[in-house]
A protein has these predicted regions:
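Adenine-nucleotide phosphate-binding core of ATP-dependent small-molecule kinases
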Residues: 546-579, 619
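Glycine-rich phosphate-binding loop plus the immediately following alpha-helix
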Residues: 410-413, 490-534
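Glycine-rich phosphate-binding loops at beta-strand->alpha-helix junctions
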Residues: 443, 580, 584-607, 618-622
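Redox- and metal-dependent alpha/beta enzyme cores, enriched for Fe-S-associated oxidoreductases
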Residues: 6-27, 229-294
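Conserved phosphate-binding/catalytic loops in two-lobed NTP-binding clefts
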Residues: 329-336, 457-458, 605-624
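Glycine-rich phosphate-binding/hydrolytic loop that grips phosphoryl groups
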Residues: 511, 615-635
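N-terminal glycine/serine-rich phosphate-binding loop of ATP-dependent small-molecule kinases
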Residues: 375-457, 596, 605-606, 610-612
Length: 635
């Protein structure tokens, strides 16, 4: 039978020993909505729980084993019991401690799980089967010596309930380390274990965390090394990293696949459950000092850390905050909602992060077209394919902008890019043969086949802002459907960034919607806000609710300039929160189409207490950065 699981504390090997075919559940990459889940679960239950619900109800599994790792998993179990009563649904209550009493309790609960599954599947568990499942072998004369190892559930419950139950110290697992990384892990874990013992109740002997069960680490001297941590991460994150020439040094997310348990012939189940419970602790465990020790060891050795979280999950936010303050390695906070729509946002963030740490080694189209790039050509082109506008810049060898165009993005990003390309070449008075290199950026960058390379808008805006004003350190870019804050160093290199591309609030589309409600043009909205005489607050951050709030203000006969000013302040407040996440450091620059809205500009300046630098055409900053990168590539 096919049984799913979502947590590393599930006794996968024991269930496989009893005949279950265990499948680690990840977010279905084809999933586009949570229609079934949201019909019987609260909207704010974490996205992974909803995705798991959809996966189980798809009919490909005979059951699932959940754990009490969080309230969302408990609510998921309730919903599954109601909607799929014929499936095997078991919630394993995992202790938050790892002391001897906790190990005994966990062993008893695993026994209850095995008993329940045995009845469901008409199967019988034995420690001999578990020993074999873990890789243990018996010599021929021992072939039948374990026939008495059928699990006595009543005896196990009785023993586990006694305070005197102990796991013999002489039977603790031992294994030689195969490399220096594992040895270093052992030292780090031992340090963490000692801290755990010092903090524990002295009347209870707390066993050390099993130092042989280390997360697998692999550091490559020839490739950028990036680690993955946090909540459950799907395979797409790894695929993107590996496609960009990155070595994944470690993966310690919830459902990482690193399971290495050493079989013990005596008391096989007791040793096994002890080992499962004393893995590298997750963030829900009482003592996470071994986890901190692991980070202390590996973070100085990697180029960056991708810290994954799931929408509406707050389990790992505290650890991320601590690592963000103390980590010697750059960290990317990556939140996904476990749907296929997350891929574009995930790709942009990961590529921008890799570019910022100098770790991106993409297989660009340029590598296939290298011979077609003319060494005698003297111009380069930068193309910024955004949601609202497509912008193009032609630059010469002297780093001078020869021509630029801004056109409306149509239904096809590729077609709009081709039109912008033709128009900018016409304005520059040159032919395609005179273009040495074309680099595309923006959300539509992957849909421009004639570009030699594509680079994220994060890197391009950083480079473009530095071109227009080298003193700029913090950039605010508000586009048609996203907004981002970028911090750059003195060389124009991105050091940190934060994005909002999951919600229309605080973007150009939001302002368009409000202008339509006020029956004025978008160009009139900003100047109208400057004429405000009354302070109005738009409380809702959601674009839909904000529009309803604006309609209510109109019904109350409030003046259009006052409403416009309130909307501009709401947009500025959302932008300011992004800027604070990357660090407020002057000089400040604003780019994107919204930089032409004087109402929003004034509201942002009031919040930061400083003037914003805005270039003559703020919409071409990204395309200018792309052209600069193209110039570097063609040299």
């Amino acid at each position: 039978m096919r049984i799913g699981y979502v947590c590393k504390y599930v006794p996968v090997e024991a269930l496989e020993a009893i005949g279950a075919h265990m499948e680690r559940i990840e977010a279905d990459e084809s999933l586009v909505s949570f229609d079934a889940a949201e019909s019987c679960m609260h909207a704010n239950v974490c996205s992974f729980a909803k995705a798991t619900f959809e996966t189980v109800l798809s009919g490909n599994l005979d059951g699932i084993v959940l754990t009490t790792c969080c309230d969302s998993m408990r609510r998921l179990a309730d919903a599954l019991h109601a909607q799929a009563p014929n499936l095997f649904i078991h919630v394993l209550d995992v202790p938050r401690d790892t002391g001897e009493a906790a190990c005994a309790l966990y062993q008893r609960r695993v026994a209850e799980l095995l008993s329940a599954y045995g009845k469901f599947a008409n199967a019988t568990f034995s420690e001999k089967k578990l020993f074999a499942q873990l890789g243990g072998t018996l010599c021929p004369e021992e072939g039948n010596c374990d026939s008495s190892l059928e699990l006595d559930y009543a005896r196990l419950h009785s023993e586990a309930a006694q305070p005197s139950f102990r796991l013999a110290k002489s039977s603790s697992v031992s294994q030689s380390f195969t490399n220096s990384n594992q040895a270093a892990d052992s030292a780090a874990w031992s340090e963490g274990c000692e801290a755990s013992e010092r903090n524990a109740d002295e009347t209870v002997a707390v066993p050390q965390v099993n130092c042989t069960l280390q997360p697998q680490t692999h550091f490559s001297p020839a490739m950028p090394n990036v680690g993955i941590a946090g909540a459950r991460a799907n395979a797409e994150i790894k695929r993107i990293l590996e496609t960009h020439g990155v070595n994944i040094a470690f993966d310690i997310t919830c459902t990482n696949a690193s399971r290495r348990f050493v079989p013990q012939k005596a008391d096989t189940l007791a040793h096994y459950t002890h080992d499962v419970l004393t893995q590298l602790p997750c963030a829900r465990m009482r003592d996470i000092s071994p986890r901190k020790a692991f980070f202390d060891r590996v973070l100085p050795q990697i180029d960056g850390l991708v810290y994954h979280t799931v929408q509406f999950c707050d389990m790992y936010s505290y650890e991320y905050g601590d690592l963000k303050r103390t980590s010697p390695a750059p960290i990317l906070a990556l939140e996904t909602d476990c749907t296929a729509q997350s891929r574009g946002q995930m790709l942009t963030r990961l590529e921008a992060f890799l570019e910022s740490i100098g770790a991106s080694q993409k297989e660009h189209l340029a590598s296939q077209k290298g011979s077609s790039m003319s060494k005698t050509a003297t111009f380069v082109v930068g193309l910024d394919s955004g949601s609202t506008s497509t912008n193009a810049v032609v630059m010469n060898e002297a780093r001078e902008i020869v021509a630029s165009v801004v056109i409306r993005t149509g239904a096809k990003a590729g077609a709009s890019a081709e039109r912008a390309y033709r128009e900018v070449l016409e304005r520059a008075g040159i032919t395609p043969d005179q273009v040495a290199c074309t680099i595309a950026t923006g959300y539509g960058r992957v849909s421009i086949p004639f570009a030699d390379e594509n680079v994220t808008e994060i890197s391009c805006h950083g480079r473009g802002a530095h071109y227009f004003n080298p003193a700029v350190r913090t950039i605010l870019d508000i586009g048609g459907q996203d907004s981002k804050a970028i911090h750059v160093n003195a060389a124009g290199e991105v050091t940190d960034f934060a994005m909002n591309d999951k919600c229309a609030a605080g973007t150009g589309r939001f302002l368009e919607m409000i202008a339509r409600s006020l029956e004025i043009s978008l160009d009139e909205l900003g100047p109208a806000a400057l004429e405000s005489k009354k302070h109005l607050e738009i409380a809702s951050m959601c674009s839909v609710f904000a529009e309803s709030e604006v309609i209510s203000l109109i019904a109350n006969n409030e003046e259009k300039p006052d409403i416009a000013a309130g909307v501009c302040r709401a947009v500025a407040g959302k932008a300011y929160s992004l800027m604070r996440r990357v660090g407020l450091e002057g000089a400040y620059m604003m780019t994107g189409g919204v930089a032409q809205n004087p109402g929003v500009v004034r509201a942002v300046e009031e919040l930061i207490g400083e003037k914003l630098f805005i270039c003559e055409d703020p919409e071409i900053v990204g395309a200018t950065g792309a052209a600069l990168l193209a110039l570097e590539k063609s040299e």
